[in-house]
């Protein structure tokens, strides 16, 4: 199996968690509830991608 099994998902997950966190913090600082919700959703998406990457890696072992 490919060495990068799950690594792409983990990388996308990390990016989404970081960007989502930034959007959430920006939304809090500017009192923009929409941006906060968008950031929280993107962080959650990142968590799912990270877990998916872990599962793919585990299955490829």
UniProtKB/Swiss-Prot annotation:
Family: Belongs to the UPF0337 (CsbD) family.
Source domain of life: Bacteria
Signal peptide span: none
Gene3D superfamilies, per database record: YjbJ
Region (Disordered), start-end ranges: 1-61
Name of the featured protein: UPF0337 protein lmo2158
